[in-house]
């Protein structure tokens, strides 16, 4: 079971928030608190973040059950502790250095690749996906409109980070051990192993994203988030039939980036 922290009740005995309490629950106040804690490592719960990372592989449903607990105790779905983001950034740095080593990049080239991966691939793409999902879910997936039936933007970004972490570990860490001697061998076994790794990684991303939105009780038709599995399976079969090697394309793209 995921560890939790005790918090004070979110409202007075009459169930109505005072003006001061209401101000503390605004989106701006939550964002300010999150960013402020980003520079205070002693206030972050890294042990809990590590537990979440483990459960994202073994039992991701438990992670989203904790989001339910946070909503009940702190009146927000999104994380208020940036520890997960910090640990994810460390994982990105370590795995990107590993990619630089495997691809025989110089120190400067590896540093440029690191900037691209952190600020574009993770944060930049994450902001776009979170904003798109925030708009789509609030516009088309909410059962009924109301302030209590609103998908927080911060939560959509958390869902992206949750789904991105397993993808990162699979593509940027596990795959490293197979690139030079297996995946880039030029044989069928090479692109079979590489493309299968991509299938598993993207499949994880789709599934954990689905779990994130299906965990919100006020959303409908969340099963449509599983539909990309059909396109993913078709693309996988086509890639094997036509000899496409996704990892080879990724390596060429990374080398092109750091020129």
UniProtKB/Swiss-Prot annotation:
Keywords in alphabetical order: Golgi apparatus, Membrane, Nucleus, RNA-binding, Transmembrane, Transmembrane helix
The record, for InterPro entries, names: UNC-50 (IPR007881)
User: What GO MF annotations does this protein's record show?
Assistant: RNA binding
Q: How does it sit in the membrane?
A: Multi-pass membrane protein
The record's principal subcellular location, in a coarse class, is nucleus
Stretches assigned to the Lumenal side: 104-112, 180-181, 244-259
Ranges facing Cytoplasmic side? 1-82, 134-158, 203-222
Signal sequence annotation: none
The record, for Pfam families, names: UNC-50
Q: What does this protein do?
A: Involved in the cell surface expression of neuronal nicotinic receptors. Binds RNA.
Family annotation (PANTHER family): PROTEIN UNC-50 HOMOLOG (PTHR12841:SF6)
Q: What is this protein called?
A: Protein unc-50 homolog A
Per the UniProt record, the lineage of the source organism begins with:
Eukaryota, Metazoa, Chordata, Craniata, Vertebrata
């Amino acid at each position: 079971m995921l560890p939790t922290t005790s918090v004070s009740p979110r409202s007075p005995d009459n169930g109505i928030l005072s003006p001061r309490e209401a101000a503390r629950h605004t989106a701006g106040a939550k964002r300010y608190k999150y960013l402020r804690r980003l520079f205070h490592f002693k206030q972050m719960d890294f042990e809990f973040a590590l537990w979440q990372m483990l459960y994202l592989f073994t039992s991701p449903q438990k992670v989203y059950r904790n989001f339910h607990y946070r909503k009940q105790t702190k009146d927000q779905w999104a994380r208020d502790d940036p520890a997960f983001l910090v640990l994810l950034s460390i994982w990105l740095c370590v795995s990107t250095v590993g990619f630089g080593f495997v691809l025989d990049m110089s120190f400067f080239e590896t540093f440029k690749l690191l900037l691209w991966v952190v600020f574009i691939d993770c944060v930049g793409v994450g902001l776009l996906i979170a904003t798109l999902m925030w708009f789509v879910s609030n516009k088309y997936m909410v059962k009924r409109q109301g302030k209590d039936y609103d998908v927080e933007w911060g939560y959509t970004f958390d869902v992206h980070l949750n789904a991105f972490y397993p993808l990162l570990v699979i593509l940027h860490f596990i795959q490293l051990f197979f690139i030079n001697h297996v995946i880039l061998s030029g044989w069928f076994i090479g692109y079979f192993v590489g493309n299968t790794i991509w299938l598993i990684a993207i499949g994880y991303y789709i599934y954990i994203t689905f779990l994130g939105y299906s965990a919100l009780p006020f959303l409908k038709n969340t099963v449509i988030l599983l539909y990309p599995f059909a396109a993913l399976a078709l693309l996988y079969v086509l890639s094997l039939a036509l000899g496409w090697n996704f990892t080879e394309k990724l390596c060429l793209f990374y080398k092109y980036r750091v020129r």
